[in-house]
Amino acid sequence: MASSSATSLRQGSSGASSGHSHPQSTSLSRHSNSNSNSSRSRSFTHQDVDPNAPSISIDTLVNHLLVAKRSLSSMTLVLRANEIANAARQSHEDVAILAAQAGFLKESILDQTTILVRVRRSLQGTYDWGKRDFKKLIRSMDLVDGGLEQTMEMLRDTSVEGVFRPEGEERRSLLDFIDEGGVHGVREAMKKSIQELQSFDGDLLRFDTDIRNLRKIITDTPALTHDDTHFPTFELLEGLVDHSANMAQLLVSLTHHFDMCVTAIRTTEGGVALARRRAAEVTQTQGNDGVSISGVIAEQESNVSDLEPNTAKDRAEMLKVVVQDAGEVNDVVQEIQERLTAMEQDYLVLQEQHDISKQAYSNMLEAYAVLGEIGDRLADYLAAEGDFKSRWDMEKESVFSKLQEMQQLKEFYERYASAYDSLIIEVERRRAVDDKVKNIWRKAQDSVDKLLDADRASRETFRQDVGEYLPTDLWAGMQGSAKKWTVVPDGEGEDVKGPALRRSVVEGARERLGRVERR
């Protein structure tokens, strides 16, 4: 009977959760279903129909039929809702799987990163140890090199006195008489050793870059959380499924209403012809919506429907329900549209979370690959540490050897400067000896000259006294003059030429030698 089938046009559920209730559901009456705990929204109720109620015009019934037919185009929206619900389930499963995999990878990578940081600290300890020795070595180098440079500067500022050099020669310093190439060679060798010691820096920097890049990937990875206050994915999924179920139920109600309209037309005289004509007109102007009124009428005529009224009272009640439900068709269609709009928006949120999870998983795969590359290079970093230690011992020994050479050069140059001062003193001493010898010979010459003068006087007296008595041929030397004596220096081995050294030069040399002896 019609009364038994005219339950309600709108059977939409308000949703599994209060957060997804439909905005129009407040206008509907709610009643409990014995087979479900979910509430029913916006259902139609009707009272017993008066058999004597006024009849409804055929035009009105046909209009209701056409509107009901047009409302069935909501099927595409319901299919889309079902598609979204299925995709949301798959997306939710994917998010859960991706989040679990990304979380597992992240924890493993963080553990490995911690180990890498410990290894890096160990390498840093070796580097710091070498750096401390290196600083001590540099200080020693600066001290020795500074002393050597100071000594060379002193030689550069010390001019060689002209008394030691040929006349007309350009003024020269003590530094001009030594080969500076030895000093430069030692310095270059030390620089090379220092560069060898600093080569470990590059390995540490590369290791730091590897760890920093790995951490950046992890840091840039979107955070995944199961806290529904941040990502209520399960709540959204429930809402989408609830929307889809309600939309399907609403579509069932629309279909039921359409079937009742067809039954009402079919049981009204002249209704079928008018309905077919009006449907054809609508099809010509608005296009085919995929629902054939003729086909439904033929199906109902070949198969007795539960909607078929058995009495006039049943038919009157059916018409009453049709009229009541017809007033709600547009609202039901609008509700389906609004629910689909809400589903599309919620699905975008789920898709965003899916994309975030996918990106997080992709980042973790990238981080895992980077970790593998670091693992391949880790042996090189550890080998670099061992190589650094061995090279440090060798190069340090080489540097200390060069430092000893520089110290020896410094001492040699200092002795060279002191020897020059000693040379000045020696030249002055020799000149003093020459002066003393000359004084002695000058005094001796005076005494000899006096003796010779006395000898000449005695010879003259002798000639005057006895010269006329002695024949000249008795002694050939009787008429000879006195012998002359002259002291002259030997030309060989003469070592002091030119003017004497200035007193200030000699005193300066003595003062410097005195300072050296007091050290």
From Swiss-Prot:
Keywords for the protein's UniProt record, in alphabetical order: Autophagy, Coiled coil, Cytoplasm, Membrane, Protein transport, Transport
Record bears the keyword GTP-binding: no
Traits of the deletion mutant: Does not significantly decrease the growth rate under nutrient-rich conditions.
Signal peptide annotation: none
Places the protein is found: Cytoplasm; Preautophagosomal structure membrane
GO CC, alphabetical: Atg1/ULK1 kinase complex; phagophore assembly site membrane
InterPro entries, A to Z: Atg17, ATG17-like_dom
Residue ranges that the Swiss-Prot or TrEMBL entry lists as coiled coil: 324-355
Entries under Pfam families matching the protein: ATG17_like
Domain of life: Eukaryota
Keyword Coiled coil recorded: yes
GO biological process, one term: autophagosome assembly
UniProt region (Disordered), positions on chain: 1-50
Bilayer topology annotation: Peripheral membrane protein
Low complexity: bias regions: 12-42
Residue spans of biased composition, Polar residues class: 1-11
Molecular function GO terms recorded: molecular adaptor activity; protein kinase activator activity
Family recorded in the similarity comment: Belongs to the ATG17 family.
Record text on subunit structure and interactions: Forms a complex with ATG13, ATG29 and CIS1/ATG31. The ATG17-ATG29-ATG31 complex interacts with the ATG1-ATG13 complex. Forms a complex with SNX4 and ATG20. Interacts with ATG11.
Main function: Autophagy-specific protein that functions with ATG13, ATG29, and CIS1/ATG31 in response to autophagy-inducing signals as a scaffold to recruit other ATG proteins to organize pre-autophagosomal structure (PAS) formation. Modulates the timing and magnitude of the autophagy response, such as the size of the sequestering vesicles, through interacting with and regulating ATG1 kinase activity. Plays particularly a role in pexophagy and nucleophagy. With ATG13, is required for ATG1 activation by autophosphorylation. Recruits ATG9 to the pre-autophagosomal structure.
Protein name, as recorded: Autophagy-related protein 17
